[in-house]
Amino acid sequence: MSASKEGKEKKGKLLGVENISPPKDKRPATRMKLLNDVGAGEDSEASTTTTTSRTPSNKQEKRGSVAGSRIKILNEEILGTPKTEKRGATKSTAPAASTVKILNEKKTPSATVTAVETTKIKTSPSKRKKMEHYVLQAVKSENTKADTTVTVVTEEDDTIDFILADDEEVVPGRIENNNGQEIVVTEDDEDLGEDGDEDGEDSSGKGNSSQTKIKEIVEHVCGKCYKTFRRVQSLKKHLEFCRYDSGYHLRKADMLKNLEKIEKDAVVMEKKDICFCCSESYDTFHLGHINCPDCPKSFKTQTSYERHIFITHSEFSDFPCSICNANLRSEALLALHEEQHKSRGKPYACKICGKDFTRSYHLKRHQKYSSCSSNETDTMSCKVCDRVFYRLDNLRSHLKQHLGTQVVKKPEYMCHTCKNCFYSLSTLNIHIRTHTGEKPFDCDLCDKKFSALVALKKHRRYHTGEKPYSCTVCNQAFAVKEVLNRHMKRHTGERPHKCDECGKSFIQATQLRTHSKTHIRPFPCEQCDEKFKTEKQLERHVKTHSRTKRPVFSCAECKRNFRTPALLKEHMDEGKHSPKQQRSSMRSAVKIMERTDCAICDKNFDSSDTLRRHIRTVHECDPDDIFGVEPHPSKRAKKDIESEEVVPVALNTSAGSLISSQTDGNGVVVREFLVDEGDGAAQTITLENETYTILPLDGAIEGEQLTDEAGVKPEAKKEEAQVSPVVKKEQRKSLAASLAAAIADNLEESCSEDDFSGEILTEEDIKLKENVGKLIDMLVDPPILKKYGWPNAPEETVLCKVIENCGHDLTKGGENYAELDYGSRMREYCKLLFTVVIHNDSIKSLLNNFPIDDVIEYVLGDEDQDEGGLDKDNESHSGDEEAVSVTGETKTNEIREKPEKKEVSAKSEKKEIVGKAVDKDNSEEVVRENKKKPVGEQEKA
């Protein structure tokens, strides 16, 4: 405790401050800091001639620290009398003003603030010189118009200015001298320029008008170039553009100490063919990505750049260059610099920009026609196109383009590697770097490197966003002139690069080279003679060979393929091909093919496999659970019987087309409807009134067309055994007749023109139709598809509407698509979809080399093919087969009509209706076959 008290007494005696213990109810002592190191480093033996006869020793504090010698002024409860001055006291500008006190209590000062005096502290001359560059001031301003400065006056009229310390907490209060005069000490923010006035107003409002405040002058220093700023915002803005490295001034101080050594090393470097100002080889000197702001030279490394700045662009103009705008550091370096102008072949340089030239008239021309000219209008323009030039030789070379004269490549500038000739030596040197792989110019903003400085400058425009070249037609801007020239060819329609094989023309030579590879097909298949353009296409083709090599075991009856003999044997053991099972398998196949609409979202699909995949992916449910759920009645009412097709091969089901050509037009359409009652244990419906139409058509009211629920009897199975086969035959015939009449009445309303266009589709057309449907689902948004009537509308209609909606008129194309068959029409529509609607160059290139069917499958991907293979395997396990077919021998066309479903009891039954259109002979054949069957089989049927 005694040691701390002695320290406080010493600090207090530095300016003659009384150290009186503060009262308990006062705040902690306020600290003030002298930013100039006046008392730093002095010996404890140095004495003064005032009340403070000895200064404290501050050897522990290093010079350059944030805090200099600190003065701690303690609070005083009672105003004390000043001590008597000792021998050797200095003169003061105001009497009895050597004591400064800080009081926490608020008192109104009786007089204005006067200057504070103290004795001089002796400092060595070296220390004094080092402190000359500090400019430290604390300014206090009154609410009145009088402004004074608080200073510490020394013996030799020197002033020691001080400010409040930043790192110590400043307690607001008043400074009072021996005469009772007080100085208000306020707390200012770090940014004085913005917040100082507001704080001053708050503090001054608490006292009288005679109260004053002390403002801090805080200097914010840049850590790179050590430039000071009054505001934080100014410092932040400066840091964005400061080009100096953080340690440049430290290295500059070392170079100043070793200036003589640098001069000796410069002479040695010149003898070794190394540039003395940047220490780079003369082969690639002054060529890099770090540009000098004072001259046109650039450098590869930061060290070379700093050495150049230190030697060539000195802050003093004691040794200026007589040729260029450089200011050398010493006379010896100036001599080397001027010798460099002469020995390196460019003795003439511009005083403004520093660019050097080999001849004097080049310099004069530069000074006349460049931005360094006093008269900026000294330019030369082309009289043909009004283009402006600064050099006469550039104008002459430009005029050769109008005359049609081409610059001839000189054979002396020939590359020995590729035997190409160039216009000049500089272009040859740049070209040689493409063979050697040398890229000396790297971008400082990314990792790219370039073989020429021009390429680096063009690349940097992409980082800066500079686009100096703009199109006069569409005002689109570009960073490189070559890109603009290529863009202009789009407006003019110029395509100078033409393919010799197919005659196609392109804008760029690279596009032609890429296109030529399509004719070369460098990837041949080792197993066949086919060739492919890309390696990916070859890999896809090789997979087809692996699939065909796999052994196939076919069923002799149904021509079905199986992977293993065990699967084939299992298929034969199931007895699917026995006469008794063929009819049930037909009905099971019809049952499988019937359900293609989703019971959740009412969306229709081409096949049950697509429906299953939709349920798994979209609704995330098990398809087996959904298949047993009936759709909502409101959704079922929207579906017509004629909107479903069982046999995709025969789309023409009109009455005229179903009559065989061999009947000479005398055939009659007779439709037979097979009603699947389910297994024998389920409840069945007994037709009690044959005069009723028992199938709900077009969502009619159930009570009008169906028998009521009283017609459904639990004991229906027993009653069925009492019905004779003749009655059942008549009932079945009446049912078929009524259904045929109902369908004929609603045929024109419910069936679309495309479904009954009278065209017979092949298997390829059916596959194309399915792929087009998937393509439409993938490319067009669902709201637009719903607007066009999808999925109820046919694929061809929706595809035509999509193409016409995109602005292409199918009637003005000059082609009559109506004369083509279904497959050709769909292929032409798909080509229009890819070329006119979808602007994709990769798809267009595929169309030039592959048929449209392959392009559609390529767009859809290989997923459908893989799933198709899995579906075949699953079908082989299940043993179900599609038994509905069309044969020319029997002249039979089959379609499926799907009626509305009626829930009769808890175990509702699905009725599946299959219509057969046959002529008279075939219909009688069917009736005779039904007569031959036993009664039990008829009941089961």
From Swiss-Prot:
- Location of the region described as Interaction with mod(mdg4) in the Swiss-Prot/TrEMBL record: 760-860
Which positions carry Phosphothreonine? Answer: 186
Q: Using the UniProt annotation, give all residue ranges assigned to the region (Disordered).
A: 1-97, 176-211, 864-941
**Which stretches are zinc fingers (C2H2-type)?**
220-242, 290-313, 319-341, 348-366, 380-402, 413-435, 441-463, 469-491, 497-519, 523-545, 553-577, 596-619
Skewed-composition ranges (Acidic residues): 185-202
* Keywords attached to this entry: Chromatin regulator, Chromosome, DNA-binding, Metal-binding, Nucleus, Phosphoprotein, Repeat, Transcription, Transcription regulation, Zinc, Zinc-finger
Q: Which SUPFAM superfamilies does this UniProt record tie to the protein?
A: beta-beta-alpha zinc fingers
Which Pfam families does this UniProt record tie to the protein?
zf-C2H2, zf-C2H2_6
Per UniProt, the ranges with Low complexity bias are: 47-57
Q: Compositional bias of type Basic and acidic residues: which residue ranges?
A: 869-880, 891-941
Location, primary (coarse class): nucleus
Q: Where in the cell is it found?
A: Nucleus; Chromosome
Q: Which GO terms describe its cellular component?
A: chromatin; nucleus
Alphabetical list of PROSITE patterns matching this protein: ZINC_FINGER_C2H2_1, ZINC_FINGER_C2H2_2
InterPro entries recorded: Zinc_finger, Znf_C2H2_sf, Znf_C2H2_type
Molecular-function GO terms, alphabetical: chromatin binding; chromatin insulator sequence binding; DNA binding; DNA-binding transcription factor activity; euchromatin binding; RNA polymerase II cis-regulatory region sequence-specific DNA binding; sequence-specific DNA binding; zinc ion binding
Q: Which GO terms describe its biological process?
A: heterochromatin boundary formation; negative regulation of DNA-templated transcription; protein localization to euchromatin; regulation of transcription by RNA polymerase II; response to ecdysone
Where does the source fall among the domains of life?
Eukaryota
How does this polypeptide assemble, per the annotation? Answer: Component of the gypsy chromatin insulator complex, composed of Cp190, mod(mdg4) and su(Hw). The gypsy chromatin insulator complex interacts with Topors via mod(mdg4) and su(Hw). Upon ecdysone stimulation, interacts with Nup98.
Which purpose does this protein serve, as stated in its record?
Component of the gypsy chromatin insulator complex which is required for the function of the gypsy chromatin insulator and other endogenous chromatin insulators. Chromatin insulators are regulatory elements which establish independent domains of transcriptional activity within eukaryotic genomes. Insulators have two defining properties; they can block the communication between an enhancer and a promoter when placed between them and can also buffer transgenes from position effect variegation (PEV).
Q: What is this protein called?
A: Zinc finger protein su(Hw)
Gene assigned in the entry: su(Hw)
